[in-house]
């Protein structure tokens, strides 16, 4: 049975909405005490980066191995294309970046190229290889006229775990959005001065509340935006599939 409407979501979208719709859940810390998180305008943005650096362990041979999300134990699965970082986690990062820019009044037209694609052991993915999963990738392009870089790594080692974005502002300040031990954190860096805000709770929960199930969900507050939001998610998948075809050849 065909649905009358389709809504394409990604839980990371909630991070973009959060920056320009701060609610009472945001808590200022230290120097930021009493101040709301920074309001973002697309006119102020000169560059934007997204990153997902997943923690990993090592097998008995000293090779990097992914970790199971639920248990933190070594993931014994043998990942194969298309389960590499480009399609697996590139979708999350793109959704976060584009929804942030959209909420800031910016142009979300996407242009993207693949700069680096390596396997789990750090070897380049060879043209024509339609089986090896990418463990690391660097994507580069533009959102509208804003330079864009995306850094993806499933094997970032024990120090991994960074998931978020950095936004360079015209006045030299940098906004960073990352995860915190029990939620999310926004920092505003101005030289050596750093202001910080945190929001407890999982991104999944925030997205469900803000976009689907909450009293002020997307269908209530902005029903006319559903089609555009879905179109952006489809465009992102199309771009990533296109990069895979360019990297590996038609398949």
Identify the residue ranges that each predicted region occupies.
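Rossmann-like dinucleotide-binding domain that binds NAD(P)(H)
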Residues: 58, 68-159, 235-238
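Short, surface-exposed alpha-helical recognition segments that flank or form part
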Residues: 43, 81-88, 199, 203, ...
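Predominantly a Rossmann-like dinucleotide-binding segment in NAD(P)-dependent oxidoreductases
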Residues: 2-105
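Generic structural motif
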Residues: 48, 106-119, 173-177, 185-186
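C-terminal helix-rich "cap/oligomerization" subdomain common to oxidoreductases
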Residues: 211-251
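A structural signal for well-ordered alpha-helical scaffolds and beta->alpha junctions
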Residues: 14, 29, 90-97, 160, ...
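Short, solvent-exposed loop/turn segments at secondary-structure junctions
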Residues: 14-15, 53-56, 117-119, 155-157, ...
